[in-house]
Amino acid sequence: YAILRVNNGQYEFDKNYLYDLKDYAVKGGDLAWLGDGKAYIRPYVIDVANKKIVANLAEMTGGDPTTTINLIQDGNLYTAVKTPAAKWFIYEYNIKNNTVKKGAEIDPGVTQVYHINKLK
C-alpha cells in the first residue's frame, strides 16, 4: 500500500509525494479522511503531510480494528474492534487528542462489522 497525492485543481499524481506503507501491517486497505491533515488506513492513523504514523489502533485497543466503513463524527473515528478473546467492542478514537475509549460491547454472535452508521 502507498498514499499518493493529487493537488487541488490537478488531474495527475504529484510526482513529489509518495508515502510508501510497505513496512507497515496495513490490513484490508480501509481508508478514511479524518480531517486536520490525518487519514486512517487500518489500523493506522497517518499524518499525511509529514508522512508519519501517529497512532496504531491495534496497539492502542489491544485488538484488531475490523470495520470496513468507519464513522467519523464530531472529531472522532468509531471502529469495531475484535479482541484476542473474540469479544467485539466499538472504540472511539479522538483525532485531536490521539486517545481511544472503549464503548459498547457487540453481541458475541457477530462475526464481522462492515459499517457503522451515525451514533445517537
Predicted regions and their residues:
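Acidic, serine/threonine- and glycine-rich low-complexity intrinsically disordered segments
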Residues: 1-43
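Beta-propeller blade signature
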Residues: 1-10, 45-52, 90-97
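Beta-propeller fold detector
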Residues: 8, 12-23, 51-62, 101-108
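Repeated scaffold domains used in trafficking and secretory/extracellular systems
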Residues: 20-36, 62-73, 108-120
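Conserved beta-propeller blade signature
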Residues: 39-40, 76-80
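Short, flexible beta-strand-to-coil junctions
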Residues: 43-44, 48, 80-85
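Outer membrane beta-barrel transmembrane domains
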Residues: 56, 65-67, 78
